[in-house]
Amino acid sequence: MGAYKYLEELQRKKQSDVMRFLYRVRCWEYRQKNVIHRASRPSRPDKARRLGYKAKQGFVIYRIRVRRGGRKRPVPKGATYGKPTNQGVNQLKYQKSLRSTAEERVGRRASNLRVLNSYWVNQDSTYKYFEVILVDPSHKAIRRDARYNWIVNPVHKHREARGLTSAGKKSRGINKGHLFNKTKAGRRHTWKKHNTLSLWRYRS
């Protein structure tokens, strides 16, 4: 068993005394720092490497905290101005994950970099903490690497804002495998298409 296998097993036993202590100490440390700050190295190297991180020039890790809880509808004092108030203001559930939100915020901060992926690192009662892997598209080490230079293409600018990262695809219902064709173009769209009786004038 290699070193990364051991690290993976440690992560699985989050309730062990050692890991609980480590999480508490790290959580305190992260709370003292800015909301978005650069990390010198990933706190979960095994996870970061599985998601594409390499300890070489051109790769950057940013750590971010996102407030937990639902998303309030952005209407001042609950004034919906013609929209039905009984559709709700407070107890709405945001359709995107907090990890996806974290990627978007880091992507806006470091707009010269490309978001590759992200992963959970910690949480407390108020916040969830994530680390986001970013790639510098103008760095020679990235541009010359055949495995990563696809991200240099301008079509991948702000991929996190368009739901093209792993976390973003999840909320869009995009995946591979059995029955995922049922979510193509959106779950509700597919349901509506299947449940709408269409009677064409000229039927074959």
Swiss-Prot record:
Q: What is this protein called?
A: Large ribosomal subunit protein eL15
Q: What NCBIfam families does its record include?
A: PRK04243.1
Q: Name one GO biological process term.
A: cytoplasmic translation
Q: What is its main location?
A: cytoplasm
Q: PROSITE patterns annotated for this entry?
A: RIBOSOMAL_L15E
Task: Tell me the subunit arrangement.
Answer: Component of the large ribosomal subunit. Mature ribosomes consist of a small (40S) and a large (60S) subunit. The 40S subunit contains about 32 different proteins and 1 molecule of RNA (18S). The 60S subunit contains 45 different proteins and 3 molecules of RNA (25S, 5.8S and 5S).
Q: Which family does it belong to?
A: Belongs to the eukaryotic ribosomal protein eL15 family.
- The gene designation is RPL15A
Subcellular location, record wording: Cytoplasm
PANTHER family the record matches: LARGE RIBOSOMAL SUBUNIT PROTEIN EL15 (PTHR11847:SF4), RIBOSOMAL PROTEIN L15 (PTHR11847)
Native organism: Candida albicans (strain SC5314 / ATCC MYA-2876)
> Any idea what job this protein has?
Component of the ribosome, a large ribonucleoprotein complex responsible for the synthesis of proteins in the cell. The small ribosomal subunit (SSU) binds messenger RNAs (mRNAs) and translates the encoded message by selecting cognate aminoacyl-transfer RNA (tRNA) molecules. The large subunit (LSU) contains the ribosomal catalytic site termed the peptidyl transferase center (PTC), which catalyzes the formation of peptide bonds, thereby polymerizing the amino acids delivered by tRNAs into a polypeptide chain.
The organism's taxonomy opens as: Eukaryota, Fungi, Dikarya, Ascomycota, Saccharomycotina
A Pfam family assignment: Ribosomal_L15e
Q: Which SMART domains match?
A: Ribosomal_L15e
The entry's keywords? Cytoplasm, Ribonucleoprotein, Ribosomal protein
Q: Which GO terms describe its cellular component?
A: cytosolic large ribosomal subunit
Record-linked SUPFAM superfamilies = Ribosomal proteins S24e, L23 and L15e
Record-level Gene Ontology MF annotations:
RNA binding; structural constituent of ribosome
